[in-house]
Structures are given as C-alpha cells and as structure tokens.
C-alpha cells in the first residue's frame, strides 16, 4: 500500500527528541503488537490493577475504531500533499482557451427558409384541425346518406303539410266572402292552388 510505505519512510526520516515516538509505529502502520493490553484483573494478590499505558490506549482505540473509518492527521496531510493538486501551480497561461468550432450550414435549414416565403400565407394545419375537418366531412356524408334513405318519407310528409296549408287558405277566402256579404263564390271562380301547383 502506497500510504503505508510513505508513512514508514516518514517515520524513519524524522528524528525524535526522545528515544521513542509519541505513538507506536505498529499503530500507524495498522499492525498489531502482541504486547500486554489493558487488563482489569490484578497481576498479583497484593498488587492493584495496573493502569494502561499510552501505547495500550492507542492499540485499544485502533481495535475499536476500524482502520478504514479513521483517518489520522498524518494521513490527511500526506493525502493533501501527494495526491491533491496545489492551488498555486496552475497559471493563467497554461490553461488552454476553449476551441470554437464552425458548424457547416444545414441544408435542411436553407430549404426551410426558402420554403417559408411561399408557405407563409398558408395556414398551419395541426392535428386538432385535421381531426375537426375529418369529423365535419363524415357528419356531412352521414347526413347525405340519411336524406337519400328517407327521401320518399320526407316527400310524403311535405305533401301533407302543403295540403293542410291549401285547405287553410281556402277557409280564409270563404271567410272574406262572407264578410263582404256574398253567400257563395261568383260564377266562374276557381280557387287557385298556390300550395299544390303540380296537382
């Protein structure tokens, strides 16, 4: 592991003021030393429980906290020095300017621009408008079919209406004669068939 090698080399290179480093090397490198750990049981019948040393506390903390989850200040400093880029290294001259690419003209766009001049007057046909036109045509077609199917029945109903109008017209003429003092129509009088012309 690269981090372990760097740590071991750093520990060898740094001279210590005392005879021993402030923390055990085995704790930094992640190895365990088979030494006397913290124990609550007394060593002898007349002796009290021995207090744990500083190295034992570090080894106990090393066992309780996994190595992958804990990052020491030395490891964070080495990571910042070796792996992360420095802020003052990059200068304005080394940064390459972004390249600008000239896109070729689109043939579809040119054709659309030329065609827009002739199609500008034409209304835009949308899907909704197309559906409305188709529905209108279908309704007209169904209406024409219904008219053709019921043309004889409609003719019969129309003739009945005209006949009733003619009878009403003759009654109105008779009432006018009676108001004028005539008991009947004059000789040679024929009531016009204004509603039944072809009959």
Curated annotation (Swiss-Prot):
Entry's Gene Ontology BP terms: mitochondrial translation; negative regulation of mitotic nuclear division; positive regulation of proteolysis
Subcellular location: Mitochondrion matrix; Nucleus
Database matches in InterPro entries: Ribosomal_mS38_C (IPR013177)
Entry keyword set: Mitochondrion, Nucleus, Ribonucleoprotein, Ribosomal protein
Tissue-specific expression: Ubiquitously expressed and especially highly expressed in heart, skeletal muscle and testis.
SMART domains, alphabetized: DUF1713 (SM01155)
GO cellular component, one term: mitochondrial inner membrane
Assembly notes: Component of the mitochondrial small ribosomal subunit (mt-SSU). Mature mammalian 55S mitochondrial ribosomes consist of a small (28S) and a large (39S) subunit. The 28S small subunit contains a 12S ribosomal RNA (12S mt-rRNA) and 30 different proteins. The 39S large subunit contains a 16S rRNA (16S mt-rRNA), a copy of mitochondrial valine transfer RNA (mt-tRNA(Val)), which plays an integral structural role, and 52 different proteins. Interacts with Aurora-A.
Function: May act as a negative regulator of Aurora-A kinase, by down-regulation through proteasome-dependent degradation.
Family: Belongs to the mitochondrion-specific ribosomal protein mS38 family.
Name of this protein: Small ribosomal subunit protein mS38
Organism: Homo sapiens (Human)
Gene: AURKAIP1
